[in-house]
Amino acid sequence: MSPPRKLHIKSYGCQMNVYDAQRMVDALAPEGFVETANVDDADLVILNTCHIREKASEKVYSELGRLRVARDEAANHGRRMQIAVAGCVAQAEGEEIIRRAPVVDVVVGPQSYHNLPQLLAKAEQHGRALETEFPIEDKFGVLPQPAPDAIRARGISAFVTVQEGCDKFCTFCVVPYTRGAEMSRPVVAIVEDVKRLAENGVREVTLIGQNVNAYHGDGPDGRAWSLGRLVRRLAEIPGIVRLRYSTSHPNDVDDDLLAAHRDLPALMPFVHLPVQSGSDRILAAMNRKHTADDYRRVIDRFRSASETIAFSSDFIVGFPGETERDFSATLALVAQIGYAGAYSFKYSPRPGTPAADMVEMVPAAVMDERLEQLQQLIDQQQSAFNKAAIGRTVEVLFERAGRKPGQIVGRTAYLQPAHVMAPDSIIGKVLPVRVDSLERYSLLGELASATSRPADAMAATGA
C-alpha cells in the first residue's frame, strides 16, 4: 500500500474560499491525499485565490516565486511537488498564469474543483492543465461528500454553500465574471448536507453565497424557496442550534427573511449587509441600484423584526470621483446606523470591470486619510458594542480549547470571541456566560450556571 500523498491548501479572501478549500480536500481524499500544515512537506500545493483584495494577482505571483524554491528543494530530495492555482484569480487570469508562471502545473476555476483529480493526472502526462470554463453540470452534484472523520475534525461550526454567483454587476466587482451568474442549490441537497453535518457533531451552520439572500432554490414542493423559507426548514434539523448567512445585498431582503429573524431563535441576530458608500452619487456610480435611504429603510425593517439584531458591513473609500461631500455622507451613514463591526478598504481597480476605466481617481494620500477616519469611527462603534456586554449574561456556543490551560473559547450570537475557564466537556454546548471584562476584541467571563443543556436539547426545544 502506497503512503498517502500530502496536500497543502493556502486560501485567501472570503468564506466561500474556506468552504471551497474543504471541498477540494474532499475531492482529493479518494486519490490518497491527506492535509498537511507544512508546505515544505506537500506533494501538492493549491493556492486558493481571491480577486477582491488589492493587488490580488501580484500576491499570487509572489507566492508562486516562494513555492518555486520549495519545489526545487523537494526535487533535490527526489520528491515531486505539484502546484495548482485555484479560485477567482485563476478564473480571471488562467492563461496569463500559465504563460507567466512555468512552476504552475494546474490552473482551475471555482466551477471545476470536482475535476481536480483528472486535471492533476493530465498535468502529469502533458506537463500542465488549465480549466476555467463554466461547465454545464452542477459541481455540487459531483463533488464527493466529506467523510465523517473529516467533518468531526473541522469542529462544531461549518459553512454550507447554498448560492453562488452574482447578477448585480457592481462596477467595481469581478465576482460576476469569476463566479458566473446566480445559481441556487436545491433545498433537498442543502438539507442533506446539513443533516450530515449535524449527525457528525456540527452545531452551527453558516449558509454562504456571493449574494446569499437572492437564494431561490428548487423546493421539494416544486416551487422556488426563499432564503427565509430555507432557514425555517434547516432550523428543524436536530442538533443545529445556530444558523447564520452571508453575504447579503440590501435589494434582496424580503419579508420571508425578516419573518425568520422574528420567529427563529436559531437564526442569529447578526447580519452582514454591505452598503459600500453613504453617498447616493457614488452608489449610482457603483451600480448598487439602491440609495442610502433605501439601505436605512432595510436596516429599520430588520430592527422592527428583531430588537436584538446587530449589523456589520463593507465600505469602499476613494471610489473614482468620490468627493469630501461623498465621504462625509458615508461617515454620516455609519454614525447613524451604528455597527458592531465593519470592513473598510481603499478602492483599487480590477481589470475588466467598468470602474477600472473611470478616470477621476482619488489621490492615494486622500484615500489613506479617509480610510483612517472611517476605521476610527468603526473601531469606536465596535468597542462600544463590546463594552456593552460587560456585566451582562450572554449565550455562548463553545467551540474549542483556548491557548491557556483550562481555557475554553466560544462565540456569542454576534461572533464575539468569549473565553472562560471550564472543562472541555462544555465544547459543543450553548451556555450562559457572565461577562466581566474585555481583552482586545474578546469577552472574558465565567459560566453563569453550573447546569446546562447540550446543543441537541436546545435545538429540539427551539431555545
Curated annotation (Swiss-Prot):
InterPro entries: Elp3/MiaA/NifB-like_rSAM, Methylthiotransferase, Methylthiotransferase_CS, Methylthiotransferase_N, Methylthiotransferase_N_sf, MiaB_methiolase, rSAM, rSAM_horseshoe. Residues 5-125 form the MTTase N-terminal domain. It is found in: Cytoplasm. PROSITE patterns: MTTASE_N (PS51449), MTTASE_RADICAL (PS01278), RADICAL_SAM (PS51918), TRAM (PS50926). GO terms for molecular function: 4 iron, 4 sulfur cluster binding; metal ion binding; N6-isopentenyladenosine methylthiotransferase activity. It comes from the Bacteria. GO terms for cellular component: cytosol. Residues 152-384 form the Radical SAM core domain. Its main location: cytoplasm. CDD domains: Radical_SAM. Pfam families: Radical_SAM, TRAM, UPF0004. Its EC number is 2.8.4.3. Catalyzes the methylthiolation of N6-(dimethylallyl)adenosine (i(6)A), leading to the formation of 2-methylthio-N6-(dimethylallyl)adenosine (ms(2)i(6)A) at position 37 in tRNAs that read codons beginning with uridine. This is tRNA-2-methylthio-N(6)-dimethylallyladenosine synthase. It comes from Rhodopseudomonas palustris (strain TIE-1). The gene is miaB.
